[in-house]
C-alpha cells in the first residue's frame, strides 16, 4: 500500500470491509459491526489535523446488496463531519475491491466463499491487505478459499460493537508467515482509531472472540438486571440506566488501573456491610459460574462457525 494524497477504505458487501486506496472506504454493513468500524474511523478523523501524516484514509465506499441497507448506513453515519467522504455502492462489490488498497472482510460467515467466487474478485484481491473479522474462520481457511494464499495478505482481527464510541477491545492475530510491516501498521492504525488493540496467538483467537466480541452483550444483560432492580424499588428507568452504566465504566477503569478485579471487590465490600450481603446473594445465584460458562459456550460456538464451513 503506497501513501497518496487521497486513499480509500472499502467495506464490501455483507460487512466486507476493504481498504481501497489508503483513505477511501467501500463499506458493506455487517450487521452492526461493519457500520461500527466505519463510524468509529470517521469519528477519529475529526480529531486529526489536515496535515496529519499518520492518517490513512480520506475517503470511504460502502458496498451493499440492498438500497435499504445503503440508506441505513447513510443514516447511521450522517452525523459525522466526514460523512460526505463515504460513497455507497449497491451490488458493486468488484468495483469496490478494485478501488481498494486493502479489505476488511466482515460478511456473514457463510457468505465469504460466494463473495470470493464473484467473477474477477480473486484477481482484484491479489496483493491487497485483507482484514477478516469473521468469527470462527481461520486464516488458513480464507487462504484456501482464495486459492493461492501466497498471493494474498490475510490477517484476522476481532473488534466489538464499542467501535461506535471508539472504545473497542480489538484482538489481532499475529501473522504466522512473513507479513509486510506496512500492512501490519495499517491494520494496527485502523483498529487503534476505534479503541484498544491486543495481539494474540492463533490458539487463543476463539477465546478472545468470546471475551472481546461477545461479552459486551453479557455486560449489557448485567446492567439491565441492575436497572430492573433499581426500577422495582422506585428509581426512574433513565436514571437507573445512566447510573448503572457509569458505575460499570468506573469499575472497569479501576480494574485497568489496579490490574486485579478482586482489589475493587475488597475495597468496596466492608465487613458486615450491605455490599457483602449483595455479593453473597450473587454467589447464591451462581452468577460467577454462569458468567464463566456463558463465555466458554460462546468461544465453543465461535469455533464451530469455522468447522461448519469445512463440513
Swiss-Prot record:
EC nos: 1.5.1.-
- Null allele phenotype: Abolishes completely the production of KK-1.
* GO biological process terms, semicolon-separated: antibiotic biosynthetic process; L-proline biosynthetic process
Which InterPro entries does UniProt cross-reference here? 6-PGluconate_DH-like_C_sf, NAD(P)-bd_dom_sf, P5C_Rdtase_cat_N, P5CR-like_CS, P5CR_dimer, Pyrroline-COOH_reductase
Q: Which molecular function terms from Gene Ontology are attached?
A: pyrroline-5-carboxylate reductase activity
PROSITE patterns linked to this entry: P5CR
Q: Does the keyword Cell division apply?
A: no
Q: In which pathway does it act?
A: Secondary metabolite biosynthesis
Is tRNA-binding set as a keyword in this record?
A: no
Which positions does UniProt annotate with glycan attachment? 59
Gene induction = Expression is positively regulated by the KK-1 cluster-specific transcription factor kk1F.
What are the UniProt keywords, alphabetically?
Antibiotic biosynthesis, Glycoprotein, NADP, Oxidoreductase, Signal
Where would one find the signal peptide in this protein?
1-31
Report the protein's function.
Delta-1-pyrroline-5-carboxylate reductase; part of the gene cluster that mediates the biosynthesis of KK-1, a novel cyclic depsipeptide with 10 residues which is a promising active compound with high activity against many plant pathogens, especially Botrytis cinerea. Within the pathway, kk1I catalyzes the synthesis of the L-pipecolic acid residue of KK-1 from delta-1-pyrroline-5-carboxylate (P5C), a metabolic intermediate of lysine.
Family in the record: Belongs to the pyrroline-5-carboxylate reductase family.
**Annotated protein name in UniProt:** Delta-1-pyrroline-5-carboxylate reductase kk1I
- Organism (species): Curvularia clavata
Amino acid at each position: 500500500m503506497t501513501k497518496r494524497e487521497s486513499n480509500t477504505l472499502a467495506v464490501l458487501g455483507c460487512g466486507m470491509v476493504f481498504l481501497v486506496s489508503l483513505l477511501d472506504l467501500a463499506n458493506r454493513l455487517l450487521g452492526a459491526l461493519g457500520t461500527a468500524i466505519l463510524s468509529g474511523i470517521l469519528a477519529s478523523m475529526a480529531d486529526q489535523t489536515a496535515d496529519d501524516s499518520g492518517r490513512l484514509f480520506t475517503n470511504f465506499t460502502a458496498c451493499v446488496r440492498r438500497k435499504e441497507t445503503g440508506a441505513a448506513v447513510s443514516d447511521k453515519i450522517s452525523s459525522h463531519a466526514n460523512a460526505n467522504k463515504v460513497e455507497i455502492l449497491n451490488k458493486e462489490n468488484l468495483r469496490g475491491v478494485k478501488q481498494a488498497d486493502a479489505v476488511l472482510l466482515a460478511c456473514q460467515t457463510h457468505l465469504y466463499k460466494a463473495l470470493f467466487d464473484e467473477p474477477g474478485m480473486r484477481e482484484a484481491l491479489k496483493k491487497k491487505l485483507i482484514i477478516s473479522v469473521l468469527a470462527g474462520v481461520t486464516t488458513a481457511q480464507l487462504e484456501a478459499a482464495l486459492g493461492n494464499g501466497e498471493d494474498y495478505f490475510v490477517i484476522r482481527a476481532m473488534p466489538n460493537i464499542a467501535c461506535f464510541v471508539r472504545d473497542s477491545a480489538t484482538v489481532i492475530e499475529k501473522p504466522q508467515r512473513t507479513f509486510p510491516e506496512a500492512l501490519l501498521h495499517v491494520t494496527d492504525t485502523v483498529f487503534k482509531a476505534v479503541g484498544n488493540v491486543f495481539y494474540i496467538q492463533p490458539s487463543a483467537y476463539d477465546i478472545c472472540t468470546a471475551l472481546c466480541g461477545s461479552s459486551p452483550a453479557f455486560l449489557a444483560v448485567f446492567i439491565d438486571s441492575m436497572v430492573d432492580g433499581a426500577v422495582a424499588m422506585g428509581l426512574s428507568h433513565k436514571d437507573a440506566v445512566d447510573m448503572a452504566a457509569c458505575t460499570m465504566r468506573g469499575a472497569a477503569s479501576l480494574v485497568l488501573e489496579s490490574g486485579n478485579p478482586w482489589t475493587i471487590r475488597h475495597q468496596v465490600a466492608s465487613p458486615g456491610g450491605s455490599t457483602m450481603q449483595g455479593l453473597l446473594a450473587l454467589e447464591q445465584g451462581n452468577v460467577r459460574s454462569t458468567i464463566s460458562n456463558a463465555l466458554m459456550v460462546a468461544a465453543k460456538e465461535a469455533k464451530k462457525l469455522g468447522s461448519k464451513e469445512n463440513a
